[in-house]
Regions:
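SF2 helicase catalytic motif II
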Residues: 130, 146-154
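Short glycine/serine- and small hydrophobic-enriched flexible loop segments
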Residues: 8-12
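Walker A/P-loop
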Residues: 1-6
Length: 154
């Protein structure tokens, strides 16, 4: 909390666009979610999301992301905007469980839904590999032609 509060305050003061809380283990992710919850209970207006690895959040036996192999990929882009809008209207805290429910309700890929939702979040809780591993990084935030003033908690 001693590190999170000043980072959230900096975002509120316009000193950054988005906060990335980087974790290595599930317990650290849980602690980050709890810290955001405590601040939200005290009145913080801040949308946070927890990103879960594709292999862990995928509904299919095999993680094969193409419309021929995955029923959630087929027509995904026809439905995902409604799923994103609906979820953003209803929730501030976007967790694995809530993303899975929304993905099931709208029959969309839960991993891709979480990535789309992350663009609307003030804070992103994720594995540090999404930032530091070039094969896993979040291209929508860290590609060469993308810019943003991001704060990182490691």
């Amino acid at each position: 909390m001693a590190v999170l509060y000043p980072a959230v305050k900096a975002i509120g003061e316009g000193l950054g666009d988005k906060l990335f809380y980087l974790t290595a283990k599930t317990i650290t992710r849980t602690v980050a979610e709890q810290a955001f919850s405590i601040l939200e209970e005290k009145g913080l207006a801040f949308r946070s999301i927890t990103l879960t690895a594709k292999e862990k959040i995928c509904f299919c036996e095999e993680t094969e992301c193409n419309p021929d192999a995955c029923p959630y990929a087929k027509g995904h882009f026809d439905r995902v905007n409604d799923a994103v809008y609906d979820m953003l209207e209803k929730q501030k805290k976007l967790t694995r469980e809530s993303i899975e429910r929304q993905a099931e309700d709208f029959h969309v890929c839960p991993f891709e839904l979480s990535l789309d939702l992350s663009e609307w979040a003030d804070g992103v809780i994720c594995d540090y590999n999404y930032v530091f591993d070039p094969t896993a990084h979040l291209k929508r935030f860290f590609a060469d032609n993308v810019s943003g003033d991001y704060l990182f908690l490691i």
